[in-house]
């Protein structure tokens, strides 16, 4: 599930690191004996752990809700990335939908990571609406590269917002 063609190589590498919990969140930097005040750059409420940032943060949750609503599914988010990867592929059904569905976690995670780094290193913050649109645009771009999405479906995504 980690290595996906038509997704940039650096994003595939990032996803692989994420599945190994090796992405340099503040929690992982602290494990290397650096003194930090660990706080999520998105919600500014909780410690920045891999599981919080990429699954449970209220900002990230908005992205998970968009895509789960498109599939009309209700789900309980797993506790960690490994559990998510184990259950995610069981939700898809047809071939094209399955392929589109499989890139959703990577799209969400990459959007979250880009926003986090923009806030951390550049001091720039997108509002929630732009954050969601960045994710949807990225998803559409990746699907379009693989001819997995039609224009009508993009409008369905935007209508949700």
PLM features per residue range, with description:
Residues 1-47, 111, 160-161:
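Helix/loop segments that flank and initiate small ligand/metal-binding modules
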Residues 1-5, 89-99, 117-125:
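Short, solvent-exposed helix-loop connector elements
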Residues 25-29, 63-69, 114-122:
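Short amphipathic alpha-helical interface patches used for protein-protein assembly/oligomerization
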Residues 96-114, 120, 160:
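Short flanking/linker segments adjacent to small metal-binding domains or redox-active Cys/His motifs
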Residues 143-161:
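C-terminal helix/juxtamembrane-tail motif
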Residues 10, 14, 24, 49, ...:
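Acidic, Ser/Thr-rich intrinsically disordered and amphipathic helical segments
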Residues 29-86:
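Short Cys/His-based metal-binding microdomains
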Residues 43, 47, 112-124, 135, ...:
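Residues that mediate protein self-association or partner binding, especially
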């Amino acid at each position: 599930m980690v290595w996906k063609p038509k997704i940039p190589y650096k994003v595939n590498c990032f996803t692989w690191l994420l599945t190994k919990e090796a992405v340099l969140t503040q929690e992982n930097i602290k494990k290397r004996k650096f003194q930090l005040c660990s706080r999520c750059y998105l919600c500014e409420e909780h410690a920045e752990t891999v599981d919080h940032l990429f699954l449970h943060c209220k900002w990230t949750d908005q992205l998970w809700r968009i895509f789960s609503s498109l599939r009309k599914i209700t789900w309980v988010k797993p506790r960690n990335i490994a559990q998510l990867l184990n259950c995610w592929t069981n939700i898809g059904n047809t071939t094209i939908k399955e392929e589109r569905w499989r890139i959703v976690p990577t799209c969400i995670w990459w959007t979250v990571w880009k926003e986090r780094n923009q806030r951390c290193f550049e001091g720039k913050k997108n509002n929630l609406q732009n954050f969601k649109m960045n994710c949807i645009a990225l998803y559409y771009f990746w699907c379009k590269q693989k001819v997995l999405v039609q224009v009508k479906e993009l409008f369905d995504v935007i209508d949700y917002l």
